From Swiss-Prot:
Molecular function GO labels: zinc ion binding
Family statement drawn from the similarity comment of this UniProt entry: Belongs to the ZFPL1 family.
Cellular compartments annotated: Membrane
Keywords: Membrane, Metal-binding, Phosphoprotein, Transmembrane, Transmembrane helix, Zinc, Zinc-finger
Protein name: Zinc finger protein-like 1 homolog
PROSITE patterns membership: ZF_RING_2
Membrane topology, from the record: Single-pass membrane protein
Annotated region described as Disordered, given as residue ranges: 199-230
Organism: Drosophila erecta (Fruit fly)
The keyword Hydrolase is assigned to this record: no
Zinc fingers (RING-type), renumbered ranges: 53-101
Domain of life of the native organism: Eukaryota
């Protein structure tokens, strides 16, 4: 589990293999539409990845891509050609992900930005509309090249209110007494009831009253948190803990300093005693020898 770096600050267990950051579904649609995203545990087991479409073998940077609800990414043209080749009477459960055999069509009650972006792709083709329960397109419309929707469409994940101005009376014109044409527009308010603005969205736009000091190691927490630390960095982090503001009671820090001082003093006394005994070993060895040999003088 990790915290996404977007303003929503959502807790997620999904991890971007390319950028090595935790990502939520909103970021998958907006900022990481073509990245390889799987669980963080999967990245710990095997961090190697191939940023190619498994259907055609080419890189995902070429062409529009679609992300399924299982978070696997494919070229939309490749996936559309593969699923369109199936029989017309194929059940929705027969359309499965080529990588993990999970059903392509999301559940009707699933509230997810990834599912909304996927539905915008599926609604452009007949096999997708059939699985979603929508009316099929005519043969002429189906033969024409469908307009490819944007993967990072704001309408799929936006929480803002959309106001559409339409003309009343079925686009019928009304004429004023002075002869000028006038149209009486009215507004229809469509609100997104699934994703209301959270309190974090309002709090992110507020400026703090006082500057907040970054925690120890906070400058490189997101960039270098997976790199191996050097002994110098570990020692500097340990020494800075004495000066960094802490929420712990002050007596704990005093107790730690006193204990560390006592241990250092005991170690110093033991070291000096050991060095003192080492210098007198040669003298004591002569007095304690049970078989002394007198020196012979010529």
């Amino acid at each position: 589990m990790g915290l996404c770096k977007c303003p929503k600050r959502l807790v997620t267990n999904q991890f971007c293999f390319e950028h090595r950051v935790n990502v939520c579904e909103h970021c998958m649609v907006q900022s990481h539409p073509k990245c390889i995203v799987q669980s963080y545990l999967q990245w710990l087991r095997d961090s190697d990845y191939i940023s190619n479409c498994t259907l055609c073998g080419t890189t995902l940077e070429q062409g529009d891509c679609v992300r399924l609800v299982c978070y696997h990414v494919f070229h939309w043209d490749c996936l559309n050609a593969r699923q369109a080749a199936l029989p017309a009477n194929t059940a929705p459960r027969g359309h499965q992900c080529p990588a993990c055999t999970v059903e392509i069509f999301p559940n009707a009650n699933l509230v997810s930005p990834v599912a909304d972006a996927l539905k915008s792709f599926l609604s452009q083709v007949n096999w997708g509309r059939n699985g979603l329960g929508l009316a099929l397109l005519s043969e002429e419309q189906n033969s024409l090249k469908a307009i490819k929707p944007k993967v990072a469409s704001q309408s799929a994940v936006s929480n803002m209110t959309k106001v559409h101005h339409i003309h009343s009376g079925g686009e019928r014109e009304r004429t004023k007494p002075n002869g000028h044409d006038a149209v009486s527009p009215h507004s229809v308010l469509l609100m997104d009831a699934f994703n209301p603005p959270s309190a974090g969205d309002y709090a992110s736009s507020r400026r703090p009253l006082l500057p907040r000091q970054s925690p120890i190691g906070g400058t490189d927490r997101d960039d270098n948190k997976y790199q191996r630390r050097t002994p110098a960095e570990l020692f500097s982090r340990w020494t800075r803990r004495f000066y960094a503001p802490s929420s712990r009671p002050p007596w704990r820090r005093t107790w730690f300093l006193v204990t560390a001082g006592i241990l250092a003093f005991v170690l110093f006394v033991y070291l000096m005693a050991w060095l003192g005994r080492g210098g007198s070993d040669a003298v004591d060895e002569g007095w304690n020898n049970p078989n002394p040999q007198p020196n012979h003088y010529e």
